[in-house]
Swiss-Prot record:
UniProt pathway annotation: Amino-acid biosynthesis; L-tryptophan biosynthesis; L-tryptophan from chorismate: step 5/5
Residue numbers of N6-(pyridoxal phosphate)lysine PTMs: 110
HAMAP family from the UniProt entry: Trp_synth_beta
Entry's EC annotation: 4.2.1.20
Identification of the protein by name: Tryptophan synthase beta chain
Amino acid sequence: MKAVLPDSKIPKRWYNILPDLPEPLAPPLDPETDEPIEPEKLLRIFAEELVKQEMSTERYIEIPKKVRELYAKIGRPTPLFRATNLEKALGTPARIYFKYEGATVTGSHKINTALAQAYYAKEQGIERLVTETGAGQWGTALSLAGALLGLKIRVYMARASYQQKPYRKTIMRLYGAEIYPSPSDRTEIGRKFLSEDPNHPGGLGIAISEAIEDVLKDEKARYALGSVLNHVLMHQTVIGLEAQEQMKEFEEPDVIIGCVGGGSNFAGLAYPFVRDVLSGKADYEFIAVEPKAAPSMTRGVYKYDFGDSGGYTPKMKMHTLGHTYYVPPIHAGGLRYHGLAPTLSILINHGIVKPVAYHQTEVFQAAELFAKTEGIIPAPESAHAIKGVIDRALKAKEEGREEVILFNLSGHGLLDLKGYEDYLDGKLEDYEPDYFPALG
C-alpha cells in the first residue's frame, strides 16, 4: 500500500513554525559581546535570503518556481508506504506508515534544503559554498545542488565517516565537489584538534568550525548548513506537507516519529502536524529518537551554547551536551552532534515532543527486521526512528489497542554497509558516556 502524489502536488510554500511556537525563540548571541547578534554579521557567513528566512515571522514562505522544478527532478513528491509486513512480523494491531525520503536521487531528505540554499546563493552571485557533513548525506546533497546550479562546493566530512563510508566521497567527487576529512590540516581549528589527537574521529561540531573558518577567508564563499537552524528545518517541511496530503488516502496518524541529530528530518515531517496541535485542531503525539552516544534531548542542558566545536558560530539557546563534547564514533554519523535545533528544544521543553534514546546495537537490530520485512535497508540514522516505531507498536500490542503510527524514513543505507557488516559480525560497540561538558 502506498500513496504517490503528482508533481503538481509539490508544496508551493514552506511552513515556518516561528510564529506558532508556544514561546518566542531566544535570539542568537554574538560570541564576542554576548548580546543579540546583528543580522549584518550573519551575512558574511550565510546567503542574504537565508538570513531573512531565519529571522522571518511569516507563517509561510513561497518556494521559488526554480526550486519546485528541481524538487520534481530529484524525486519529489516522495512516496508514502504502509509497512504491512512489519506489522505482521510484530503481531501488532498498530498500523504503520512511513514517508520514504530515500527515494530522492541522493537517497535522503537533505536535498530539500540543499537545493534551496544553493538557489539563493546563486541568485546572490556567490561562487562557492562550504559545508560540513557527518555521514555524508548532506555533503552529497549539497554537491548535487551545486552541480545543478553551477556552484563550487567544498565539504569537510567527519573523519570517522570519511573512513567508514568511502563511497560517499566518490559520489561527492563525481558531482564535482572537493572533500576533506575533518579535522583537517587546512584550517587552524582542524590543526588544533589534530595536534591533540592525530587520529581524531571528528564530528559535526568540528567540521562546522572548519567550514566557517574556510568561508571567512573568501568573500565569494558562503556557508551552507545541513540542520539545526530554522531556515533549514523550514525547507524540510515539504516532507510533512506532502505526508498530510498522502495520509488523506489512508487515515489520521496518532503518533509521529523521527530520528534526531540536529533536528531537520524530524521537523520536516513533524512540524506541519505540530502546527495543527498548537492551533488546537489535532492531538497528535510526537516522539523524537536519538542515540545514547549523543543524547542532547534526554541528557542535555537547555542553555546558550555554540553550534560548533571551535566557537565560531553565534551562541544559540538549545539542548546541548556542550560544544566541546567528544561524540563517540557511532555509525549514525548524521546524529553525532552535541546540540539541537532551538525550535525543537522549545517543543521538548513544553512537552509537545517526547524524546527517547537507544544504543546503536538495538537500532541495527530494528533495521535488520525492517530490511527483512519491507525490503528497504535504512540509513543508520533513520533506523533510530524504526526502533522507536517498533517499541511503540509493541506497546500497542501489549495494551491491545489500535494505533496509527507515521514515521520518517529519512534515507536509505546502501552506502552505510560497513555499519551493517560490523553489526552482523558482532563488532558493534555501544557507547553511553557519563560526562558531558554542559553539565560540568
